[in-house]
Every structure is written in structure tokens, then in C-alpha cells.
Amino acid sequence: MSLAHTAAEYMLSDALLPDRRGSRLKGLRLELPLDKMVKFITVGFPLLLMSLAFAQEFSSGSPISCFSPSNFSVRQAAYVDSSCWDSLAHHTQDKAGQYKVKSLWPHKALPYSLLALAVAMYLPVLLWQYVAVPSLSSDLLFIISELDKSYNRSIRLVQHMLQIRQSSSDPHVFWDELEKARKERYFEFPLLERYLECKQRSHWLVATYLLRNALLLLFTSATYLYLGQFHLDVFFQDEFNCFIKTGLLHDETHVPELITCRLTSLSVFQIVSVSSAAIYTILVPVIIYNLTRLCRWDKGLLSIYEMLPAFDLLSRKMLGCPINDLNVILLFLRANISELISFSWLSVLSVLKDTTTQKHNIDTVVDFMTFVAGLEPSKPKHLTQHTYDEHA
């Protein structure tokens, strides 16, 4: 065995990918980075604000401070604070002497509305987790495994052809094998490509992904509506007139009907309202961008794997409308690019292929690795002429 042949064998052996069977499921990312960011913000931010509201309530005591008359006892003053917080309504008297009541309940419901918002924003996450993730994880495991196996099969094919070249005394045998490998499919059943074609006709994952983002937009719109309808109406009101002629003070003739109370938690209410509107306004373009990514193919990823035999979705123009499950899977393949060991190898080979002087004879990884192993990528002219003379 020659030194060059040994070096080529070592080089091809090093190019083979290790078997990572069983360890990939834990490392798979089943949420896109932007989706994960949106999840943490839409769910975590309301919970953070809810904690702020509860902390302010516990630290400052009563969220309102009523200006009770000086002749009130401690018991009566405590009753006024409790009664006004329970009713939390602003009373004004019109010219006819009738009371107009304006409810200030958004102040009281603030922590619970934030909790409801966090729960609502978590529903799209649960939808994706239980409806799409089981199917997506199996798809990714199979496709990643098959892509790496296809790369390994290509390298083993080059090893086999190198052995044929070294063991055969007739160079025509090697070139016949090489031409046959170029013209025919390397697999009797191109399972991966047919599986990807099947996913191109499926719309389960993409429908779930669209529904997830549509629900996020719907709940965000509901948040805007809630803030505009209820919070804006009481946003600047720091005082209110409370009707106290009830319960303990109902029969007290010397007690006024209305007293003034001040909302001590108004600043927290305003901070929560403004920050919620600002954060969700920022997130809307992110959600829309996530949806627009479904309108285009990741041809950069596909073009790299065009170097594999029997993987020609691009060259055969098999890509149609991008709104299907295959496009969603490609987005997650890009997010799990660290799990695709073959991608880094093929990326390097693709760059090197573009710099070689014999591009017309190098189409797949088999052609390039054959060339790197020290073999001619095409039949030498003297052998071609010899074959032509024999047929003549």
C-alpha cells in the first residue's frame, strides 16, 4: 500500500462523523430563539409586574388613604378605609342631587388581571408543546440522523472507490464505477428526499405555528383593548369621593355622606399600564417577523445539502409555496444547526469546491472527496481517447 493511499484512507476516516445515537433528543431545540424570547417576555413580564404590585401593597399597607373627619374614632376610621376599598367607586353629585358612580375596580383587579394575562399568554406555548412538539421532535431526529448518515455513506462510497482504484490493474474499471456513481442514484430508495417531499404536502406543523402566533396577536390586541378601555379612564385619577353612609355609619347623623380618599398605589398602576403597553408594542413586530419567515425558503441550508447524493430539492425546482411543514422543519434545522455535524463539514467542502479550478466535474461530496483523495475528478483524456479508438 502506497503512502499516498494510506494518507487518503486516514483523511477519509477522519471525515466520517461519529455516531451520536441516543444523545440528540436532549439537545434538540424545539422552540425557535425568537419564539422563546417572546414566551419569556409575554409570560414572565406580567408575573414580574404582579409581584411588584403585591410587594407595593404589602410594604405600604392599605392601597388607599381616606381623610376621615377628626371626630371619628379609630374603629370608624378603619371602617371607612375598609369600606371605601371594598366599593372603590368615585361618587359625584349632579344638579338634581343624584349621585353618579364611577367604578375604579381596575386598581383593585390589577394583580389578578396581570395573572390572567400571563396565563392567557402561556396558552399558545401549551398549544405548541402538546400539539406540535411530539411530531416535530421525531421529524427532526429522523432528518438530522438521515442527513448525517447520507454524508457518511458518501464518504464510505469514496473509500470504496479508492480501494477499487488501488486494487484494479485496469483504470477503466474505476472510471466506469465513478461514471456510474455520478449518473445513478446512490440509494435504491431515497427515503429522506421522499420524506421531505411528503412534509412539503403536509400542513399540520405550519397550521399549529400560525395558530400559536395568531393567538399571541389576539391576546396582545385584547391587552391593548383592556388598557385603553379600563386603565386609561382612571389613569390620572389619584383621588375619589367615597360614599360612607353604609353599615356601621348608616345611622350616624353627624357623618357626611362623602369623604375624599387618595390612591396611594397610583404610581404603581401607571408604571404597570405604561410598561405593559410598551413591551407588547415592541413584541408585535417580532411576532409578525416570525410569521413572515414562513413566506420564504431557507435556500442557504438546502444549497449546502445539495452536495449530498439524491438530495436535489433545489436543482429539480421541487420547492413550491413555502407555507408548509417542510419550511417549519427547515427553520428548526437552522436552529439546531449545532446538532447537524454534517453541516459544518459540507459548508467547508462547499467553500473549497467553489475555489477549485475544476468546478464542472465536482457536483457532490463524492466528487470533491474523490478529488481530495488524490484521484482525478474526470476520466483522463488519454483514457477517453483510448476508449473512443476501441469503439471506432
UniProtKB/Swiss-Prot annotation:
It is found in: Cell membrane; Endoplasmic reticulum membrane. One of its GO terms (molecular function) is gap junction hemi-channel activity. The keyword Ribosomal protein does not apply. GO terms for cellular component: endoplasmic reticulum membrane; gap junction; plasma membrane. Coiled coil: none annotated. Pfam families: Innexin (PF00876). Keywords: Cell membrane, Endoplasmic reticulum, Glycoprotein, Ion channel, Ion transport, Membrane, Transmembrane, Transmembrane helix, Transport. Glycans are attached at residue 71. The chain crosses the membrane at residues 40-60, 114-134, 216-236, 268-288. PROSITE patterns: PANNEXIN (PS51013). Expressed in skin, cartilage, heart, lung, liver, spleen, thymus and kidney. Not expressed in brain. Expressed in calvarial cells. It catalyses: Ca(2+)(in) = Ca(2+)(out); ATP(in) = ATP(out). GO terms for biological process: cell-cell signaling; osteoblast differentiation; positive regulation of interleukin-1 production. It comes from the Eukaryota. It is a multi-pass membrane protein. Residues 61-113, 237-267 are extracellular. Residues 1-39, 135-215, 289-392 are cytoplasmic. Belongs to the pannexin family. Regulator of osteoblast differentiation by functionning as a Ca(2+) channel in the endoplasmic reticulum which regulates calmodulin (CaM) pathways. Allows ATP release into the extracellular space and activation or purinergic receptors. PANTHER family: PANNEXIN (PTHR15759), PANNEXIN-3 (PTHR15759:SF3). Homoheptameric. This is Pannexin-3. It comes from Mus musculus.
